[in-house]
From Swiss-Prot:
IF-3 binds to the 30S ribosomal subunit and shifts the equilibrium between 70S ribosomes and their 50S and 30S subunits in favor of the free subunits, thus enhancing the availability of 30S subunits on which protein synthesis initiation begins. GO terms for cellular component: cytosol; membrane. Keywords: Cytoplasm, Initiation factor, Protein biosynthesis. It is found in: Cytoplasm. SUPFAM superfamilies: Translation initiation factor IF3, C-terminal domain, Translation initiation factor IF3, N-terminal domain. PROSITE patterns: IF3. This is Translation initiation factor IF-3. GO terms for biological process: ribosome disassembly. Monomer. Signal peptide: none annotated.
Amino acid sequence: MQAPPVKEGPRMNEDIRVPRVLLIDQHGEKQGVMPTSAAIEAAEEAGLDLVEIVPNADPPVCKILDYGKFKFQEQKKKNEARKKQKVVELKEIKLRPNIDQHDYEVKARSMHRFFEEGDKVKITLRFRGRELAHPELGMKLLQKVKVDFEEVAKVEYEPRMEGRQMIMILAPR
């Protein structure tokens, strides 16, 4: 024998199995605490459903409304919230310790764009050959980046050597 399927969403009408409820009518006005059967009758008279809005309250709060419309509004709110939610991405900018001024400006423009879009930026400074003997040049460049972007970004991960590269992560303010 199979158990009856569990219903999703709030309980409504005869599914509300508490003796008393706090009723709010279809106009949003509080009607007070009353027996559940009386609240269901009031909902039927209005041609609407009695929906349990706050089940954990004492007594539970129920509202008279059109359940189909209510469900649609809830779905709409969920979709709006999902649209507004932005996943923060980690964008990477690769630099060299002896980068030319114009090349640096081009990279800086793309970093500005990433910060405007709300993304974090990982700055990877690659050392090759003898450049590895002068990590202070890399540190100087990353300090320049930090100063140039202090109004729009904050340092999330301080400059640090990892193998042949130096890494720093900036996050938008």
